[in-house]
Amino acid sequence: MSRPDSVNVAEAKAVIAGKEIKSQQLLKLVAELKKERVFGLARKALEKHQADYLNKRISIPSQTDKRKLTQQLSLCTYKDPDLNPTDKLDSALDFLKGLDSLDLKSNDCTKDQETLSQAGAIFKRKWELTSQTAYLETSLAYYARLYVNRSG
């Protein structure tokens, strides 16, 4: 016999089925789902919310909320155990590229700590999957940029 869904899982399923939710509420729900390690469901709820505001079914979130939602979508995508490992890392990176420049050779490269941290983690996982040294070097470069930005 399977155990019943948690309140958070039930809420996420309702969002996926079409229940409207405000961006701030969704961010709180995603935080709880991550604690429960239900990354796939969190990802699907974030994707549904994103599709709803892109298709103008709900109001567009503030720029700050949109950034946080996209960062959480990236995180939940690359941590979702049900997705193909290579594809999920590429998708997560694409979400981040939609927010900011990730070009380490450019002065326009993001200074956003969460984005840099996730980019470093994604490239580290790419290295773990492929053993390609270039991925590890790129990961370290993102973490170095993060360190420099924090140090000021």
Can you say where each PLM-predicted feature lies in the sequence?
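Amphipathic alpha-helical repeat scaffolds of TPR domains
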Residues: 6-47, 56-83, 108-129, 151-152
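Alpha-helical repeat scaffolds
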Residues: 6-13, 41-52, 86-103, 133-145
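Generic detector of contiguous secondary-structure segments
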Residues: 78, 96-110, 146-150
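Short Lys/Arg-enriched alpha/beta "domain-start" segment
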Residues: 2-4
